[in-house]
Amino acid sequence: MNDSLVIRGIEFKSRLWVGTGKYKSFEETARAIEASGTDVVTVAVRRVNIIDRSKENLLDYIDPKKYKILPNTAGCYTVEDALRYARLAREAGVSDMVKLEVIGDEKTLFPDVCGLLKATEILAKEGFIVFPYTNDDPITAKRLVDAGAAAVMPLGAPIGSGLGIRNPYNIKIILETVNIPVIVDAGVGTASDVSIAMELGCDAVLVNTAIAGAKDPIMMAEALKHACIAGRLAYRAGRIPKKLYASASSPIEGMLT
């Protein structure tokens, strides 16, 4: 059965999305992307020269026929910077999609919610397909929907922390609050974190540091691929209710007396 994710008419076959920062080399990045089974790759516009392609570039290692390139505005601390880099990526023909980041604090890398809402509204009106990186607040998520976001990307934990999904209850409330896809972004540390996000009902998970920072990034990428598939299947299958007391799994009818 086809279980692709469709956002604004764009089909995403993989629910594991992969970032491209912190790898040892472009070659390792390409191998990890391949092992992950993803078809969505995020690229920081600030760190990739999308104008001058005469020099070695990450985009030389990513086949645009095989992967959807999702430019992101990582490292932007103002609305103006975020708008500039989003527009630059589109003008260069990379994509109409943008993973929008407006960072509010250098130490925690938490988003500037006010700036994020403003930038989302502006870019959505300009025809961008906006995927804003946000906190795990359901009210903020709802306001991003109103601002024109195509999906919301709440953090599981601070970027690069590897702490996992620290507040699954808020993520669950976001899922119940918004009528657009929810993609967990940031904080994933290992395969079980991906599985938890998918079991909660999230539509996808974006991972970077958990792969790039692993002892064996290629092996971890493959592990996360399987965790994403398993978590999604478990969500669709429907887990049993949690109970305080035991319930025998073997029937008592026909027992010898």
From Swiss-Prot:
It is an enzyme of class 2 (transferase). Its EC number is 2.8.1.10. GO terms for cellular component: 2-iminoacetate synthase complex; cytoplasm. The keyword Cytoplasm applies. It catalyses: [ThiS sulfur-carrier protein]-C-terminal-Gly-aminoethanethioate + 2-iminoacetate + 1-deoxy-D-xylulose 5-phosphate = [ThiS sulfur-carrier protein]-C-terminal Gly-Gly + 2-[(2R,5Z)-2-carboxy-4-methylthiazol-5(2H)-ylidene]ethyl phosphate + 2 H2O + H(+). One of its GO terms (biological process) is thiamine diphosphate biosynthetic process. The active site is at residue 99. Keywords: Cytoplasm, Schiff base, Thiamine biosynthesis, Transferase. Pathway: Cofactor biosynthesis; thiamine diphosphate biosynthesis. Its main location: cytoplasm. InterPro entries: Aldolase_TIM, Thiazole_synthase_ThiG, ThiG. GO terms for molecular function: thiazole synthase activity. It is found in: Cytoplasm. 1-deoxy-D-xylulose 5-phosphate binds at residues 160, 186-187, 208-209. The keyword Transferase applies. Gene3D superfamilies: Aldolase class I (3.20.20.70). PANTHER family: THIAZOLE SYNTHASE (PTHR34266:SF2). Belongs to the ThiG family. Homotetramer. Forms heterodimers with either ThiH or ThiS. Catalyzes the rearrangement of 1-deoxy-D-xylulose 5-phosphate (DXP) to produce the thiazole phosphate moiety of thiamine. Sulfur is provided by the thiocarboxylate moiety of the carrier protein ThiS. In vitro, sulfur can be provided by H(2)S. This is Thiazole synthase.
